[in-house]
């Protein structure tokens, strides 16, 4: 009778250990997947920042420089004060 109780207690202990190990593995998997999803989201946001902020800024800067150079080429010469 005592041996049957000991085997049952050992079996319950082993099953408990298996459940504990599976739970820890699931928890670690969830944490790793959450970290990777966060990392992927950050990379996507950086790409969106490049598309929405950096590229238009470079475009506006280049167009402004082109207009400035064009204006300097076509503006009339400055009159001297004596000629006015």
UniProtKB/Swiss-Prot annotation:
UniProt keywords, alphabetically? Apoptosis, Host Golgi apparatus, Host membrane, Membrane, Transmembrane, Transmembrane helix
Annotated localization: Host Golgi apparatus membrane
Q: Output the Gene Ontology cellular-component terms.
A: host cell Golgi membrane; membrane
Record InterPro entries: E_protein_bCoV, E_protein_CoV
Give the domain of life. Viruses
- Keyword Transmembrane listed? The answer is yes
Residue spans, topological domain Intravirion: 40-80
Which membrane topology describes this protein? Single-pass type III membrane protein
Biological process (GO) annotations held by this record are: disruption of cellular anatomical structure in another organism; viral budding from Golgi membrane
Kindly list the residue ranges recorded as spanning the membrane: 19-39
Those parts of the protein on the Virion surface side are: 1-18
Q: DNA-binding among the record's keywords?
A: no
The principal location of this protein is: host cell
Assembly and partners are described as:
Homopentamer. Interacts with membrane protein M in the budding compartment of the host cell, which is located between endoplasmic reticulum and the Golgi complex. Interacts with Nucleoprotein.
Record-linked HAMAP family? BETA_CORONA_E
Family of the protein in this entry: Belongs to the betacoronaviruses E protein family.
Q: What does this protein do?
A: Plays a central role in virus morphogenesis and assembly. Acts as a viroporin and self-assembles in host membranes forming pentameric protein-lipid pores that allow ion transport. Also plays a role in the induction of apoptosis.
Q: What is this protein called?
A: Envelope small membrane protein
Per the UniProt entry, what species is this protein from, by scientific name?
Human coronavirus OC43
């Amino acid at each position: 009778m005592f041996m049957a109780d000991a085997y049952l207690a050992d079996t319950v202990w082993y099953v408990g250990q298996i459940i504990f190990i599976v739970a820890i593995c699931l928890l670690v998997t969830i944490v790793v997947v959450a970290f990777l999803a966060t990392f992927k989201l950050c990379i996507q946001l950086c790409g969106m920042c490049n598309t929405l902020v950096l590229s238009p800024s470079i475009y506006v800067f280049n167009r402004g420089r082109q207009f400035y150079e064009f204006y300097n080429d076509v503006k009339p010469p400055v009159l001297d004060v004596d000629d006015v």
